[in-house]
């Protein structure tokens, strides 16, 4: 299979207008997957939450009013689905690279400069670059980064074929429910930021192995849903940019690390702060 055909299949599978394609249900909670039961949850933010977020969110967030793009707080009902307990790691992504010949996570300095939002100098990117199809030494259990939306979709397509189940990227609502539970809490653990529960605020200055912050587990049992890296979703902003979730990254202030926070990025963006996890569909659940 050529890389072009593989990517076309991945995009068609994950971005189809109808997300109720049949697949034998076999997803269940285990070491790697968490089942999120059907039912309503509180999604988005209200003025009270955003005011708190701006107080703890840093000067750039306040100056640019980053949190004003968040969806209004409301009850949303979803069908049951399963989601990865952990972010996709370098080791897992390397198996995909080796079996498909897909491009490895990397970016040249020119490509990086053209993206236009240089949060970090290219020198900071170099430790994350893959070489000869292999992830950097010592980072096997770290989340894979420097992947675009298409790269993440291609991985989900490959995983679907390999495990004979339907994997895709989460929509924004699915990611948010898995991160905050049903009661509308700001963070996976509650409504107030707590030190030591997430890899954030540049305290480590790097990604960490997935699942390292056990105290920050979400109500459903997902890890790293605040801090470490932002995560791709299949949802879009009106301007066509992809909605990124993930509760911020290792480089972000606490206000950005809330479950309701959302950020728009070009779909071809590759950055050391961007990773992903997958959803496994259950009983051809229809997302409303």
Specify the residue positions occupied by each region the protein language model found.
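Well-ordered beta-strand positions in beta-sheet-rich domains
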Residues: 33, 40, 73-75, 80
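N-terminal secretory signal peptides and thylakoid transit peptides that target proteins
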Residues: 1-14
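Functional-site microenvironments in short loops/helix caps that host divalent-cation chemistry
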Residues: 35-36, 42, 46-65, 103, ...
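C-terminal segment of N-terminal export signals and the immediately downstream linker at the start
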Residues: 1, 17-28, 32
């Amino acid at each position: 299979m050529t890389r072009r055909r593989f990517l076309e299949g991945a995009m068609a599978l994950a971005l189809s207008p109808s997300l109720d394609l049949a697949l034998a249900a076999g997803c269940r909670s285990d070491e790697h997957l968490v089942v999120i039961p059907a039912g309503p949850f509180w999604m988005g933010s209200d003025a009270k939450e955003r005011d708190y977020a701006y107080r703890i969110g840093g000067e750039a967030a306040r100056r640019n009013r980053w949190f004003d793009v968040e969806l209004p707080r409301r009850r949303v009902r979803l069908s049951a689905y399963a989601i990865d307990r952990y972010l996709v790691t370098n080791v897992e992504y390397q198996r995909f690279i080796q079996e498909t010949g897909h491009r490895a996570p990397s970016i040249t300095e020119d490509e990086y400069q053209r993206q236009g939002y240089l949060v970090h100098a290219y020198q900071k990117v170099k430790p994350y670059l893959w070489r000869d199809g292999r992830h950097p030494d010592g980072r096997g259990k770290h989340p894979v980064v420097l992947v675009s939306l298409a790269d993440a979709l291609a991985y989900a397509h490959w995983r679907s074929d390999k495990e004979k189940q339907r994997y895709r990227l989460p929509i924004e609502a699915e990611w948010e429910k898995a991160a905050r539970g049903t009661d509308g809490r700001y963070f996976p653990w509650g409504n107030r930021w707590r030190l030591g529960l997430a890899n954030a605020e540049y305290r480590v200055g790097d990604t960490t192995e997935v699942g390292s912050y056990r105290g920050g587990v979400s109500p459903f049992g997902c890890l790293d849903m605040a801090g470490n890296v932002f995560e791709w979703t299949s949802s879009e902003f009106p301007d066509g940019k992809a909605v990124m979730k993930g509760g911020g990254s290792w480089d972000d202030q606490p206000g950005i690390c809330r479950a309701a926070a959302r950020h728009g990025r070009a779909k071809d963006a590759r950055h050391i702060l961007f990773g992903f996890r997958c959803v496994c569909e259950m009983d051809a659940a229809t997302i409303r």
